[in-house]
Regions:
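Conserved RecA-like P-loop NTPase helicase motor core
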Residues: 111-193
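Conserved C-terminal RecA-like helicase domain
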Residues: 20-132
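The feature primarily captures lumenal catalytic ectodomains
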Residues: 12, 16, 28, 200-201
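Long, hydrophobic alpha-helical segments
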Residues: 192-201
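Short secondary-structure transition/capping segments
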Residues: 75-79, 158-160, 200-201
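Conserved P-loop NTPase catalytic core
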Residues: 1-21, 67-71
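Short alpha-helical segments and helix-capping/turn motifs at coil-helix boundaries
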Residues: 10-22, 96-97, 135-139, 170
Length: 201
C-alpha cells in the first residue's frame, strides 16, 4: 500500500538526515520495524515487496544523481515536506548532497524477517548499518531497537485488554530526544488511541 511506501521513503530520508548530522557516519545505525500481519507467510510477501521497492528507489536516485532525471526529487518531495519540521528542512535541505546520503543509506540497507522462519535473513544483515525488520510475535517480546526511526504498525491483537503485550510493544520505541524530530510512527487511529490511553495511565 501507499502508506507502506511512504514509510519506507521516510526511513531512507530520516537515516540520511541523521547521517548528515554526524561526524563519524560509519558508526550510525538506524532501524525500521514493520508489524502488519501475524501470519508468517505474509511476512515473506512484505519482505519481497519492500526489497523490490528499494531497488526501484535505488534506480531513481542513481538517475537523479547522474542528471538523467529528477525522478527521486519528485518521489521524495511529498514525504520530505510532510514528515519533517521547518528546522530540520533548514538544516538538511533536500538537495544533491542529501540525495547522495540517501544513496549511501541504500547501499548499506538490509531487510530481515523477524519470526520463527527467518530463513537466515537476520544473519545476512548483521553488518548492515540501516536495517528493516518485518515480523509479528517475536517483535512483541520486549525487543528494543536502537535508533528506531520508522515504525509501521497496523496490527492490533484481537483480544481486548492485552495490557502486557501492548506495553511490551511500547518497548520497541528506543527513542532519544537528540533525534526525536526524525521519528515517525505510522499506524491506525484505533492503535494510536489505545497507546494514548496507556500513556495516560
Amino acid at each position: 500500500p501507499e502508506s507502506l511506501q511512504f514509510a519506507v521513503r521516510h526511513f531512507i530520508l530520516a537515516s540520511a538526515i541523521l547521517l548528515s548530522k554526524q561526524k563519524n557516519q560509519s558508526r550510525i545505525h538506524t532501524h525500521m520495524v514493520i508489524h502488519a500481519f501475524r501470519e508468517v507467510e505474509k511476512h515473506s510477501i512484505i519482505y519481497n515487496w519492500v526489497a523490490n521497492y528499494i531497488e526501484t528507489i535505488k534506480g531513481s536516485i542513481e538517475d537523479s544523481l547522474s542528471g538523467e532525471s529528477n525522478d527521486a526529487f519528485v518521489l521524495f518531495f511529498d514525504t520530505y515536506n510532510k514528515c519533517f519540521t521547518d528546522d530540520v528542512k533548514q538544516n538538511s535541505p533536500f538537495d544533491k548532497h542529501l540525495l547522495q546520503l540517501m544513496s549511501d543509506v541504500l547501499d548499506n540497507i538490509g531487510i530481515a524477517l523477524h519470526n520463527g522462519k527467518d530463513q537466515g535473513t537476520r544473519d545476512s544483515i548483521k553488518f548492515k548499518s540501516h536495517q528493516i525488520y518485518i515480523g509479528a510475535q517475536l517483535l512483541e517480546r520486549g525487543i528494543t531497537f536502537d535508533r528506531l526511526l520508522t515504525t509501521y504498525f497496523t496490527r492490533w491483537p484481537r483480544s481486548d485488554g492485552n495490557m502486557d503485550t501492548n506495553l511490551q510493544r511500547a518497548r520497541w520505541f528506543g527513542y532519544r530526544l537528540k533525534y526525536a524530530e526524525l521519528i515517525k510512527l505510522f499506524t491506525t487511529e484505533t492503535i494510536a488511541d489505545e497507546f494514548s490511553f496507556l500513556a495516560e495511565m
